[in-house]
A protein has these predicted regions:
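N-terminal beta-strand motif that seeds the catalytic metal site of vicinal oxygen chelate
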Residues: 1-16, 60-62, 109-144, 149-155, ...
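Core segments of cupin and vicinal oxygen chelate
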Residues: 1-2, 9-49, 133-171
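Vicinal oxygen chelate
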Residues: 4-13, 42, 55-134, 154-160, 165-167, 172-174, ...
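Acidic (E/D-rich), amphipathic helical modules within compact regulatory domains
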Residues: 21, 30-32, 37-42, 46, ...
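A short beta-turn/loop motif at secondary-structure boundaries
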Residues: 34-35, 56, 88-90, 178-180, ...
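A short acidic-to-branched-hydrophobic micro-motif
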Residues: 50-53, 173-175
């Protein structure tokens, strides 16, 4: 329904500082096009694509690509999705903006805005990107929204944070209670996470405060990017 996941679009007041932070975590820059009017860069670990946008607007958007977007509007409306903003003019780079019941911003774009990597990139220093976790007071309402968008919901029983996982072929979302942590999270896992955390600390990348309750700080850590994006690194197994 939404198309293929493109990137987590992140608004940053200082794109250079954000790029430097993610490169220290092992992300690599990709080539971008000229469809956007503001400074824009993309970094990836081979699974996650972070689009850094030096502009005003929502802090984070989940961006998808759906060719023929103008013709797709009626299908979205019929399925109960109502865009709150649209750019569909003949001279526009077509875009629809939506928002899920938990307040997560979503963008549907006519075409890609960066070139995919020519070869697989090794995972970042953070470990395996397992998904994007959203805080949601009404888990069932948010679950229904993403199921209607084509995601498959799975109940989670062995995760220290997430209660529901929502999967597609290009992105996994999870839902957690805001009392655990009130912000969205990029979640990475690795069975050897303590060693990864030690290497990051030795390289001068230090964890932020506010690790969700129940997670051992010796084996798990929360990092905050300059623009405010939170990355949760969890020991797996």
């Amino acid at each position: 329904m939404f198309g293929r996941f493109l990137e987590l679009s992140v608004t940053t007041p200082d794109i250079a500082a954000s790029v430097q932070f993610y490169e220290r975590l092992g992300f690599a820059q990709l080539a971008t096009g000229d469809a956007l009017p503001h400074p824009y860069g993309v970094l990836s670990d081979g699974r996650l694509y972070l689009g850094l946008h030096q502009r005003t607007g929502p802090a984070r958007r989940l961006s998808f690509v759906h060719p023929g977007l103008a013709r797709h509007v009626h299908e979205l409306l019929d399925a109960g999705f109502e865009p709150h903003a649209a750019r569909l003019g003949d001279d526009d780079f077509h875009e629809l903006q939506l928002r899920d019941p938990a307040g997560q911003d979503i963008a549907l774009l006519e075409a890609r805005t960066f070139s995919p990597p020519r070869s697989d990139h090794d995972r970042s220093h953070c470990g395996w990107f397992s998904g994007y976790s959203l805080p949601a007071f009404d888990i069932e309402q948010v679950r229904d929204y993403w199921e209607r968008a084509g995601f498959v919901a799975l109940d989670v029983t062995d995760d220290p944070l997430a209660q529901v996982a929502l999967t597609s072929d290009t992105l996994t979302l999870s839902l957690h209670q805001p009392r655990a942590i009130a912000a969205p999270l990029l979640v990475f896992t690795d069975p050897d996470m303590p060693e990864r955390l030690a290497r990051l600390a030795a390289a001068g990348v230090h964890a932020a405060r506010g690790l969700p309750a129940g997670l051992d700080p010796r084996a798990n850590a929360l990092f905050e990017a300059p623009e405010g994006t939170l990355l949760l690194l969890i020991a797996e197994g």
